[in-house]
């Protein structure tokens, strides 16, 4: 059985989701959540929290593969830089736990899940609920992480929409 962790890095909230693929390539949602940090803490402390919590998630679920959403540069360079720090910590945690990282542009993830590279958060949540049966999810950070994991499964050819 293949287990994939999908990650949506962020300094305030890093979304994560774990899926498994069985022999028939059916997707099962095993778990998901957010790693939240307090904005009152220093950047270093926030990054340390993300790193330690992500290592715990990886240890608990033992995924075989990892998929991470690439960052985009927005109008605020400080926000982009801070997001880059969070992403760097996520990459480090994956490297330390010996997980191979696969990266996907946000537009590619959206297109593979919804058919629209510019889909909004509600469309992502709607589609992941269509793909993964009996899913109750409201947090867009978890939905984004789940979309990244599903995108990886589709891209690898491990899974196909029926």
From Swiss-Prot:
GO MF term list: crossover junction DNA endonuclease activity; DNA binding; magnesium ion binding
Protein's GO biological process: DNA recombination; DNA repair
EC number: 3.1.21.10
Substrates-to-products reaction catalysed: Endonucleolytic cleavage at a junction such as a reciprocal single-stranded crossover between two homologous DNA duplexes (Holliday junction)
InterPro entries: RNaseH-like_sf (IPR012337), RNaseH_sf (IPR036397), X-over_junc_endoDNase_RuvC (IPR002176)
Database matches in Gene3D superfamilies: Ribonuclease H-like superfamily/Ribonuclease H (3.30.420.10)
Domain of life: Bacteria
Residues where Mg(2+) 1 binds: 8, 141
GO CC annotations on file: cytoplasm; Holliday junction resolvase complex
Cofactor field: Mg(2+)
Compartment(s) where it occurs, according to its Swiss-Prot or TrEMBL record: Cytoplasm
Catalytic residues (UniProt): 8, 69, 141
Pfam short name (any one): RuvC
Binding site for Mg(2+) 2: 69
Annotated PANTHER family: CROSSOVER JUNCTION ENDODEOXYRIBONUCLEASE RUVC (PTHR30194:SF3)
Subunit structure: Homodimer which binds Holliday junction (HJ) DNA. The HJ becomes 2-fold symmetrical on binding to RuvC with unstacked arms; it has a different conformation from HJ DNA in complex with RuvA. In the full resolvosome a probable DNA-RuvA(4)-RuvB(12)-RuvC(2) complex forms which resolves the HJ.
Known function: The RuvA-RuvB-RuvC complex processes Holliday junction (HJ) DNA during genetic recombination and DNA repair. Endonuclease that resolves HJ intermediates. Cleaves cruciform DNA by making single-stranded nicks across the HJ at symmetrical positions within the homologous arms, yielding a 5'-phosphate and a 3'-hydroxyl group; requires a central core of homology in the junction. The consensus cleavage sequence is 5'-(A/T)TT(C/G)-3'. Cleavage occurs on the 3'-side of the TT dinucleotide at the point of strand exchange.
Family: Belongs to the RuvC family.
Name of this chain's protein: Crossover junction endodeoxyribonuclease RuvC
Protein's organism: Wolbachia pipientis wMel
């Amino acid at each position: 059985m293949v287990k994939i962790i999908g990650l949506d890095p962020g300094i305030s909230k890093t979304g994560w989701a774990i899926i498994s693929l069985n022999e028939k390539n059916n997707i099962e949602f095993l778990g998901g959540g957010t790693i939240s940090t307090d904005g009152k803490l220093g950047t270093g402390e926030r990054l340390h929290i993300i790193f330690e919590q992500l290592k715990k998630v990886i240890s608990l679920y033992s995924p075989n593969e990892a998929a991470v959403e690439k960052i985009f540069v927005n109008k605020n360079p400080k926000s982009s830089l801070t997001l880059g720090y969070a992403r760097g910590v996520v990459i480090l945690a994956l490297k330390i736990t010996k997980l191979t990282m696969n990266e996907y542009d946000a537009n590619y993830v959206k297109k593979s899940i919804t058919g629209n590279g510019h889909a909004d958060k509600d469309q992502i949540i709607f589609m992941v609920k269509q793909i993964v049966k009996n899913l109750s999810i409201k947090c867009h950070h978890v939905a984004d992480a789940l979309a990244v994991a599903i995108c990886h499964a589709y891209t690898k050819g491990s899974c196909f929409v029926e």
